[in-house]
Regions:
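Acidic, divalent-metal-coordinating active-site segment for phosphoryl/phosphodiester hydrolysis
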Residues: 174
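Nucleotide/phosphate-binding catalytic cleft detector across ATP-hydrolyzing
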Residues: 1-171, 179-297, 303-352
Length: 352
């Protein structure tokens, strides 16, 4: 590498961000993923002074005193709280720029910071601006937006530049993004505001309705991860779920089965399936034929739900595969486009 390029690397910093409803990941060019934290901010009520961000804030969900509120700035894949999103981005970008030194830590200085942020496909111009502005206020000089399914497809290594169909289904915390991609462009896509959060909420509603048991988001997520599945498993499992009895208000433990949790998640899973089917139905015949051979690629945290690939393959008749590391797919995609400027401008909307 020339002296010029070494100096250029020191003067500029390129950052890719998967700004997710559930988690935020930050990729720094030539260094890889530097931040992987929950998209949660804890603040003092009244003053909105930030108390904690990320892992520390998530541990506070449902456990804060009256003076502190733990919030998730994004809902359904888009920004719900502008101020908190800006605070969170500032924290994560600062963390991505921080390096450990022998005598402490040091923030890497950069004359120019270029940021690529992944966003749901089909969001409005107002919603795009709501992403760009906090990123700029957090220190970015240039901000590019890339649609999440495109970023995920690039991240998992699909040959998107080929003249053939590639299908990606990215199931995040707030949205499910379905897209058919060919020649570096999205030919057909669908975004539904159903994701991991909706699965958690369906479990909360089920426990409340059937057992009069109130459980929190973290407990519901743990149940989903532990015994949740999209299809019948060889051996049904059980799990003790702790919560508050809605009748007498006392702590209570209920044993639930994987079959019950599968039933609880049936509605949001059906919505995800419908979005896949609609996208397939609207896909040009030649590209649809490609998908029979290439199959569907699953990415995002929701792809880790037990048996989801098997269930989707059964329901669509198309081979379905889970990405090697579905949680990192989008941020890896933002990282890859940062390495090629011409490609970056081709697959993203203009920087600001």
């Amino acid at each position: 590498m020339s002296i010029f390029h070494r100096l250029f690397g020191l003067l500029n910093m390129d950052i890719g961000i998967d700004l997710g409803t559930a988690n935020t990941l930050v990729y720094v060019k030539d260094e890889g993923i530097k931040v992987r934290q929950p998209s949660v901010v804890a603040v003092k009520k009244g003053s909105n002074e930030v108390v904690a961000v990320g892992d520390d804030a998530k541990r506070m969900l449902g456990r804060t005193p009256d003076t502190i509120s733990a919030v998730r700035p994004l809902r359904d894949g888009v920004i719900a709280d502008f101020e908190m999103t800006e605070a969170m981005l500032k924290h994560f970008i600062k963390e991505a720029r921080t390096r450990d030194k022998g005598n402490g830590t040091k923030i890497i200085k950069a004359s120019k910071i270029r940021v690529v942020v992944a966003v749901p496909s089909g969001i409005t111009e107002v919603e795009k601006r709501a992403v760009k502005d906090p990123a700029r206020h957090a220190g970015a000089d240039e901000v590019y937006l890339i649609e999440e399914p495109m970023a995920a497809a690039i991240g998992v290594g699909l040959p998107i530049q080929d003249a053939s169909g590639n299908m990606i289904v990215d199931i995040g915390g707030g949205t499910t993004e379905v897209a058919v991609i060919s020649l570096s462009g999205i030919v057909q896509s669908r975004s539904v505001r159903v994701g991991g959060d909706e699965l958690d909420e369906s479990i909360i509603a089920y426990m409340k309705k059937k057992y009069n048991l109130m459980i929190g988001e973290r407990t519901a997520e743990a149940v989903k991860i532990e015994i949740g599945s999209a299809t019948v498993v060889d051996q049904e499992t059980t799990m003790d779920v702790k919560g508050r009895d809605l009748v007498d208000g006392l702590p209570k433990t209920i044993k639930v089965t994987s079959k019950e949790i599968r039933e609880a998640m049936a509605e949001p899973l059906s919505a995800i399936l419908d979005s896949v089917k609609v996208t397939l139905e609207r896909c040009p015949p030649e590209l649809a034929a490609d998908l029979v051979d290439r199959g569907i690629m699953l990415a995002g945290g929701g792809a880790l739900l037990g048996g989801l690939d098997i269930w989707l393959a059964e329901q669509t008749g198309i081979p379905t595969h889970v990405a090697e590391d579905p949680l990192q797919a989008i941020v890896e995609g933002t990282g890859k486009v940062l390495n090629e400027i011409s490609f970056l401008k081709k697959v993203t909307s203009a920087g600001v």
